[in-house]
């Protein structure tokens, strides 16, 4: 059996996601509530403010959701482990989704003129995700 050359990318990608979730849990939600009035309407995602209030009131929900997200990704990685094509597709979708949220965090910080508490992982992601994407798309 030939080894799947893209399997090694799951761990750093999931590591960045996990680190981002930890960073987000520390104080991002309170920051979002404080600055939501400065975020342009086209950047406001539906139900994020509601989720922010829920997370402040019940942090265990956010912890559960974060663990659930990472468990789902690990399950998908497990299912795709024998197929390089499936791994490339799943990793590509995961990287696109992760990129969307990291760029969204950067944009809302830019438009509020405030440093949100998740910028460290966002900037790391902006550096690493193009490298990982290149490794996924090259043959």
Please provide the spans of the model-predicted regions.
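Alpha-helical transmembrane segments of multi-pass integral membrane proteins
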Residues: 106-139
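Interfacial helix-start motif at the membrane-water boundary
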Residues: 46-68
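Core segments of transmembrane alpha-helices
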Residues: 60-77, 100-101
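Membrane-interfacial loop-to-transmembrane alpha-helix junctions, especially the N-terminal start
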Residues: 6-10, 86-94
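Aromatic-anchored segments of alpha-helical transmembrane domains
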Residues: 17-22, 96-106
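Juxtamembrane "helix-exit" motif on the non-cytosolic side of transmembrane helices
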Residues: 78-82, 103-112
């Amino acid at each position: 059996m030939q080894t799947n050359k893209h399997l090694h990318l799951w761990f750093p990608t999931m590591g960045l996601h996990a680190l981002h979730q930890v960073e987000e849990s520390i104080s991002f939600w309170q920051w979002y509530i404080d600055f939501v009035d400065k975020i342009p309407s086209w950047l406001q995602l539906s139900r994020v403010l509601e989720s922010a209030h829920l997370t402040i009131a019940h942090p265990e929900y956010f912890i559960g959701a974060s663990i659930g997200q990472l468990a789902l990704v690990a399950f998908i990685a497990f299912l795709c482990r024998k197929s390089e094509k499936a791994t490339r597709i799943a990793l590509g979708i995961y990287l696109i989704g992760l990129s969307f949220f990291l760029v969204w965090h950067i944009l809302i910080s830019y438009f509020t003129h405030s440093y949100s508490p998740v910028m460290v992982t966002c900037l790391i992601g902006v550096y690493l995700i193009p490298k990982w994407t290149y490794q996924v798309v090259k043959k």
